[in-house]
Swiss-Prot record:
Pfam families in alphabetical order: MGS (PF02142)
GO molecular function annotation: methylglyoxal synthase activity
Organism: Haemophilus influenzae (strain PittGG)
Enzyme class: lyase
Binding site for substrate: 19, 23, 45-48, 65-66, 98
HAMAP family: Methylglyoxal_synth
Annotated protein name in UniProt: Methylglyoxal synthase
Reaction equation(s) it catalyzes: dihydroxyacetone phosphate = methylglyoxal + phosphate
Gene designation: mgsA
Active site: 71
EC assignment: 4.2.3.3
Function in brief: Catalyzes the formation of methylglyoxal from dihydroxyacetone phosphate.
SUPFAM superfamilies, A to Z: Methylglyoxal synthase-like (SSF52335)
Domain MGS-like stretches: 6-152
């Protein structure tokens, strides 16, 4: 597939997601980085978003809870280029009933080439990168070209 570029602006649209057993870790991480996150637009799946907003005072756009369709909503926002990066604290030791949704979410994040952190260490690296606070060009699928080829 051919690619084109997309600009992630200095004010990022960040998805915050956590499996149930990791919500406390994500909350602690978010509290630690509250000032760095404040200028950005934050999205989260339902339960996580409500917890983060209540406990940190940050403005969070809460979607549905992950198992109720929130992972799919988030995937749609990524495909529409409305999410720039994702912090997803997931639990590799416990299966979740919505694992297929999680796999689909990770696949879409990979297809659209957004930065993804899957634990505290990788989230720290993303947030402290010099690229975090500046405009960044990333390669993304050339959907228009893809569509033209398919319809030719």
């Amino acid at each position: 597939m051919h690619t084109t570029t997309r600009t992630l602006t200095q004010h990022k649209r960040i998805a915050l997601v956590a499996h149930d057993s990791c919500k406390k870790n994500l909350l602690n991480w978010t509290q630690k980085h509250k000032e760095a996150l404040k200028p950005h637009i934050l999205y989260a799946t339902g339960t996580t978003g409500h917890i983060l907003e209540r406990e940190t005072g940050l403005s969070i756009q809460s979607l549905l809870s992950g198992p109720m369709g929130g992972d799919q909503q988030l995937g749609g926002l990524i495909a529409e280029k409305k999410i720039d990066m994702m912090i997803f604290f997931w639990d590799p030791m416990n299966a979740a009933p919505h694992d297929p949704d999680v796999k689909a979410l990770m696949r879409i994040a990979t297809v659209w080439n957004i930065p993804v952190a899957i634990n505290q260490s990788s989230a720290d690296f993303l947030l402290t990168s010099v690229l975090f606070e500046q405009d960044v060009e990333i390669d993304v699928p050339d959907y228009e070209g893809y569509l033209k080829e398919r319809l030719a």
